[in-house]
Regions:
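A structural signal for multi-pass alpha-helical bundles of membrane permease subunits
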Residues: 4, 9-10, 14-240
């Protein structure tokens, strides 16, 4: 399938970018949501040094996309990257791997960076919502014999569902519109394995000078972003 994209199949490249966009969005959204929820629940407990942990977790969010992309590109480097050095020493691989130059691993290496940067954003929303729940509610539930799992499903989740939904939509907009990380790390390669609709539109417009195709892809992206933005605005207005 990938090889056929190299022989000029515009439809194949376009379809692959759409498929990658869907996979990129779903994996990012699910992993970031679950990880953010777990971290927020942990930081909502009375932990020693909680403020330090909170600050450290927020660091990825504060790092600019360009800095994060360059840093991880260096870490993934086949010759001097720390990931290869550690993996070889631990016996996980026998020789250095070009992680970003390999069709099978490039997509997952880039998505790992996006997940690393995206988790803190959603965690802030969830943690803020959790801190608004009175401890008395949980104490009453525990007296009635409710387990922690039951408290989460019957108390926590219903109370934070609105801010959780809003943060998820905002995160979704950021995930779908992500361009910098992919372009700086792989430019959609190798062999279009990390190509998403945004990089596809950029390539067609500014490299291939095919402005018609780029404009069509941009219109589709605009429609999706408008829908997500509309959902977000509706949620905010209903909450108010």
């Amino acid at each position: 399938e990938i090889a056929s994209c190299l022989v000029g199949s515009e439809m194949c490249i376009r379809d692959r970018s759409i498929g990658n966009t869907v996979k990129w969005t779903v994996v990012n959204l699910v992993v970031q949501l679950v990880a953010a929820m777990l971290l927020a629940l942990a930081l909502n407990q009375k932990l020693k040094g909680r403020s330090v942990y909170r600050t450290l977790i927020l660091v990825p969010w504060a790092v600019p996309h360009a800095i994060a992309a360059m840093t991880f590109t260096f870490l993934y480097n086949a010759n001097v990257g720390i990931i290869n050095i550690l993996a070889v020493k631990l016996g996980m691989i026998t020789e250095s791997v070009s992680w970003l130059g390999n069709v099978g691993s490039a997509f997952w290496c880039v998505i790992l960076v996006a997940i690393w940067k995206g988790i803190p954003f959603q965690m802030i929303f969830i943690l803020a919502a959790l801190q608004g729940i009175s401890r008395d509610v949980y104490e009453s539930a525990e007296i009635d014999g409710a387990s922690r799992w039951q408290c989460f499903w019957r108390i926590t989740l219903p109370i934070i569902k609105e801010p959780l939904a809003i943060s998820t939509v905002l995160n979704l907009i950021g995930i779908v519109s992500c361009f910098n990380t992919i372009w700086l790390m792989t430019k959609g390669g190798p062999l279009y394995s990390t190509e998403i609709v945004y990089t596809y539109a950029y390539r067609r417009a500014f490299i291939d000078h095919n402005f018609g195709t780029a404009a069509a892809a941009s219109v589709v992206l605009f429609i999706f972003m408008a829908v997500f933005s509309g959902v977000y605005l509706k949620m905010v207005s209903e909450k108010e």
